[in-house]
């Protein structure tokens, strides 16, 4: 269906729209849009993904654009969070711009971009000590140990570790918890504490904050 695309060129999916929200936090914008009946497929720190369907109309497009313009105006006016997003947790008297700057400062201070990038660096990929089947069998046979998240470095995970967003497996069963992987998930615990309404779903990391733990292979 796309015969006009030149060879070796990447094809942008015409049914997906990726919106960069910086300086507004993408999860905040997602909450706002969903409260106005606009469905966001997913969000990370500063991007939103929308899916376009064949039946979508120009009216729906214009509606989304008007809501984004409303957000922009609210940001410039530093509209109180109690007005813009009354259902979200914020500091007393905090405006939308104040909240957004605090969010950005947190990500910069914690090195969110660096921590995320390290997960996709081939030099830092975890080593597999067991196959997925072996890890699953070890778990079922009781050769497992529950350890606090901060003490997971160097241990063999018996569960898949997956944060959503982005919905990409970071650690497969049988792979070793590396410093890069652990640092990222410790950061996510801080993120969940600082912005509880934006907590990502994390498969394989149980509990929250100081109570977070993971299942690893029991040491001999």
What are these regions (language model features)?
Residues 2-220:
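Non-catalytic terminal extensions of PLP-dependent enzymes
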């Amino acid at each position: 269906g796309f015969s006009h695309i030149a060879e070796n060129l990447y094809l942008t999916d015409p049914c997906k729209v990726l919106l960069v929200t910086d300086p507004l936090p993408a999860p905040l914008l997602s909450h706002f849009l969903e409260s106005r009946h606009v469905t966001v497929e997913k969000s990370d720190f500063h991007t939103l993904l929308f899916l376009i369907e064949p039946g979508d109309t120009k009216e729906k497009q214009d509606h989304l654009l008007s809501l984004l313009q409303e957000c922009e105006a609210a940001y410039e006016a530093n509209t109180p969070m109690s007005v813009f997003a009354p259902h979200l947790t914020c500091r007393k008297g905090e405006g939308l711009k104040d909240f957004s700057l605090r969010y950005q400062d947190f990500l910069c201070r914690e090195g969110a971009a660096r921590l995320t990038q390290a997960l996709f660096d081939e030099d830092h990929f975890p080593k597999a000590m067991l196959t997925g089947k072996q890890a699953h069998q070890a778990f079922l046979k009781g050769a497992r140990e529950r350890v606090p998240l901060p003490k997971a470095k160097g241990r063999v995970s018996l569960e898949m570790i997956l944060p959503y967003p982005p919905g990409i497996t970071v650690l497969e069963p049988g792979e070793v918890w590396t410093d890069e992987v652990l640092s990222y998930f410790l950061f996510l615990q801080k993120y969940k504490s600082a912005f509880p309404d934006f907590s990502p779903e994390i498969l394989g990391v149980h509990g929250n904050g100081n109570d977070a733990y993971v299942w690893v292979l029991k040491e001999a």
